């Protein structure tokens, strides 16, 4: 919550996966096709996973597009015999807060932003519900309300020692200018 922290290496590959099926993430369209992996993209995926796995004992990446490409990444982890290391941390945020952020940054209508949130969220939840990978669910709003508690639970899930002093480097309650969205009307197809 202090900045975006998207991993650019993974974001580029996620964009390539989506572009391969004619989807541009910057179009903000909510009808999103299932990505396909070409040999060239697969080689890039293998290379980046091997690079990070060799360089770091504990590593991961953050990119919202991974909600759409998670199945393709799991295939790579499986082929590299790294599937035992895979743990998913799914951080959700209220639909209206995401929509407000997209409106502020990209002048996207609120309803379109909420539909996009729904597409991303349904895709990743469907994946998590139909697979047995260890998954930790947390909310963006919860992290802002009690960062140390949420981060400690996340580190427990990762089976890694937690140093509470790192929280101040990564969590800034003022960074979220889109609010929590508690006062907004959400369309029925989003709230169901």
Regions found by a protein language model. Name each.
Residues 1-5, 90-96, 100, 129-191:
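The conserved 3'-phosphoadenosine-5'-phosphosulfate
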Residues 44, 72, 119, 123, ...:
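Alpha-helical elements of Rossmann-like donor-binding domains used by nucleotide-donor carbohydrate transfer enzymes
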